[in-house]
Curated annotation (Swiss-Prot):
The keyword Hydrolase applies. One of its GO terms (cellular component) is cytoplasm. May function in recognizing stalled ribosomes, interact with stem-loop structures in stalled mRNA molecules, and effect endonucleolytic cleavage of the mRNA. May play a role in the release non-functional ribosomes and degradation of damaged mRNAs. Has endoribonuclease activity. It comes from Thermoplasma volcanium (strain ATCC 51530 / DSM 4299 / JCM 9571 / NBRC 15438 / GSS1). Its main location: cytoplasm. This is Protein pelota homolog. Keywords: Cytoplasm, Endonuclease, Hydrolase, Metal-binding, Nuclease. SUPFAM superfamilies: Dom34/Pelota N-terminal domain-like, L30e-like, Translational machinery components.
Amino acid sequence: MRLLDKDEKLGRYTLRIENLDDLWYLKNIIAPGDKISAVTFRRIEESSDMQRSREKERIPIRVTIEVEKIEFQDFENRLRILGKVTNGPEDTIGKYQSITVSEETELDVIKVWDDDSINMLKEATEQEHAAVYLAIALDDDEANVFIIHPYGIQQMGTIYSGRSGKYSESSYSETSYFSAIENAIKQFKYPIIVIGPGFAKNGLSAFLKERNYKVVAVSSSNRTDQGAIYEFISSEDGKKLISKEQISRDNEIVSAFLSSLRRGSGIYGSEEIRKYLEMGALSDLIITDKKFRSETGRELLSLARSVGTDIHIVSTSNDMGEIIEKFGGYAGILRYKVQQ
């Protein structure tokens, strides 16, 4: 991601998206209520029947929208941002408009920038990003494709083999199955991890290597869902491969919190967190990416910094973040047990 311009007084940063990882960072930086300004396209409404029968012409317009929803689409290197138009052509004001962001898109992000958003932006605009991996968890019936980002796991979609079940086809072959997987992943230029039960994983690994894909790990698992990815991340081979990634750190700190909870030195909930922060008794504050944007989240982060508490922001796009979200989005590990 490239920073083209900024106006700190207005909270406006002009960015250019350069690769898929930038889209992941952007998804984590922006939130509902922020404003995005970019060029998008609208269709010209034609009046005559003959004109309506033709494909409508699309013209570029520049709009600013107030963000309501942000989403990736399966197997597409695009981020779709939806919201109401606050600035643009007069007939678009107040209407819903989507802005599609992909490689080479330039856009303005206008928001109240807290320290964590700024830190994430700084990391995104550094020349070298943390490693990203493509993971395929498969058996003989289906293959689930994931991207392991520094901040979590993104499921891209599912490819069915057609061997059995509702997607069964009489023309099934292993080669056609592997070719369908290759066709789905060829747009991604990341090192590949292949995971799953049985022999399908070994067959796919050999198939991809013959076609010059970089397969960096093959691992056994009884699962083909996102849980298989976490099994790999927690394994010794997985730790060696992605030990520096955010997802690995999320696993480590959440596991430490759950252990501390069993020992009586773990706490959760915003009020409990606030109480022990004010006492200076909290060693680690764990907060989800959903909560760190909230007013309460910003207050607790500021308090944690003032007393020297270590801060960990975990992504709700992975299981570890979802665990903390079930504890209210806020969790902590005490420096010492406090007498009540």
